[in-house]
Amino acid sequence: MSIYKNHIAIIGAGISGLMLGIILKKHNIPCVIFEKYNTVSEYGAGISISPNGLKILEELNLLNKLKMVSANPYKTNFYSNSSMITSIPVDVVTTSRQSLYKVLLDEYLSLQGDILFDHELIDINLSKKTLSFLNNIN
């Protein structure tokens, strides 16, 4: 795997791994994602992304793509005994994990990002600067 000798290794192709990969690729920093499973996960629950997360998505030009496949509530209502007692504005995007994952995966792949599947990490050798995987590919 000497073609990745000078790349930053990202362990895991989840939301965080893809986000890091996108940031690195957009800054022209070579990276590769190693994923222990043989495919991406399609499972997950609904999530709400708060302003700090939205800011990062905006900086990466991904917020509008995510909003197109998400709910964008503008307020939250509070009720007591079936009567609304107050309403406050909210700045969140509510989406499914799958929708967020697809936006991130599509972006990472469009940046020519590599994901190596079936690569379960079993060891990091800091002195040799090598990774070892369960599939014996180093």
Regions found by a protein language model. Name each.
Residues 17-18:
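N-terminal Rossmann-fold NAD(P) dinucleotide-binding loop
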Residues 2-8, 50-138:
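Conserved N-terminal helical subregion
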Residues 14:
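Glycine-rich NAD(P) Rossmann-fold beta1-alpha1 loop
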Residues 11, 23-45:
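Glycine-rich FAD pyrophosphate-binding loop
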